[in-house]
Regions:
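Mid-to-C-terminal alpha-helical segments outside catalytic/metal-binding sites
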Residues: 1-11, 97, 197, 201-207, ...
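Generic structural signal for hydrophobic
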Residues: 3-7, 58-61, 69, 96, ...
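Short catalytic/ligand-binding loop motif for oxyanion handling, primarily in non-cytosolic enzymes
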Residues: 21-22, 76-79, 138, 158-161, ...
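Catalytic pocket-lining loop regions of alpha/beta-barrel enzymes
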Residues: 34-37, 83-208
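Active-site beta-loop-alpha junctions enriched in small/polar residues
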Residues: 17-18, 46-50, 71-75, 106-110, ...
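Divalent metal-coordination and catalytic microenvironments
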Residues: 12, 43, 69, 96, ...
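Active-site gating/metal-coordination segments in enzymes
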Residues: 10, 18-104, 173-176
């Protein structure tokens, strides 16, 4: 929150993490964050640890507290081996659809068919996909499912031929800053090569994200470089697409009641 005004942040997604036995504490913490941020943080509840009955009750008694469900990380230990179209998750999406909630997920590798099946069965739910595992199949998914969206963030910043984002392959702030500044043009040109055509095929469903990881990735010096890169990349998109990708798509999806394309 301290950097919101300094970095001119209009809004962001915040994940609300809890467990069923501590539901009351989870809701109180979420209410506090929403109030302290003056609504700039759109809260997503991680739904996989709650029963369907609890999710329905939360929405009944706390309408408007959460803008979506997620992040559901299918690549991560707790969900590893589960599929986005397992019945457990289809039940969650049904609650999301009833309450106009976005569903954000980070699928594991080769789960595009499972994601597509979930999107097909829930056409009234907006699915915000995140993560490099869906980078190759995302266009085909968007072609087939108008309710699929995608956020791009650190995976834009790569040094060829590495598949990993520089923000995650760097060991510390100093290493990141040195590598970033020495290879800025290489990083930017690769990002344009990888993403420009895709974004312009579906200009209303891609959005710029700011996902980070270790504590040092939130350092002000790092933030300045990420902002510089984001602006430089956006400037390489067609003028009619730039604002959409930068913030309009995200605001329409999340900040304005989940209205989509």
């Amino acid at each position: 929150l301290c950097n919101f005004d300094k970095e001119k942040v209009r809004g962001t997604i915040g994940f609300s993490i809890g467990i069923e036995p501590l539901l009351e504490e989870t809701l109180k913490a979420a209410e506090s964050v929403k109030m302290d941020s003056s609504g700039k943080i759109s809260l997503f509840l991680m739904p996989q640890v709650f029963s369907t009955e609890s999710l329905e009750s939360i929405e009944t008694t706390n309408k408007g507290l959460f803008a979506g469900y997620g992040e559901i990380a299918f690549y991560f230990v707790a969900q590893k081996g589960q599929n986005p179209d397992d019945q457990k998750y289809l039940d969650i999406y049904e609650v999301a659809g009833k309450n106009n909630l976005v569903v954000m997920m980070h699928p594991d590798a080769r789960q595009e068919n499972s994601v597509g099946n979930a999107a097909r069965k829930n056409p009234n739910v907006k699915f915000l996909i995140h993560g490099p595992e869906m980078e190759d199949p995302i266009i085909n998914m968007m072609n087939n499912h108008p309710n699929v969206y995608y956020s791009i963030d650190a995976i834009l910043i790569r040094i060829p031929p590495s598949p990993g984002g520089l923000l995650y392959t760097s060991n510390n702030k100093e290493e990141f800053i040195l590598t970033f500044t020495e290879n800025f043009d290489v990083l930017l040109n690769r990002a344009v090569k990888d993403w420009k055509e895709k974004i312009e095929q579906h200009p209303d469903r891609f959005m710029w994200g700011t996902d980070r990881a270790h504590k040092w990735t939130y350092d002000e010096e790092v933030s300045v470089l990420l902002e510089e890169f984001g602006r430089a990349f956006i400037a390489r998109l067609e003028p009619a697409v730039q604002k959409k990708f930068a913030y309009e798509n995200a605001e329409r999806l999340i900040g304005m009641g989940g209205e989509g394309e």
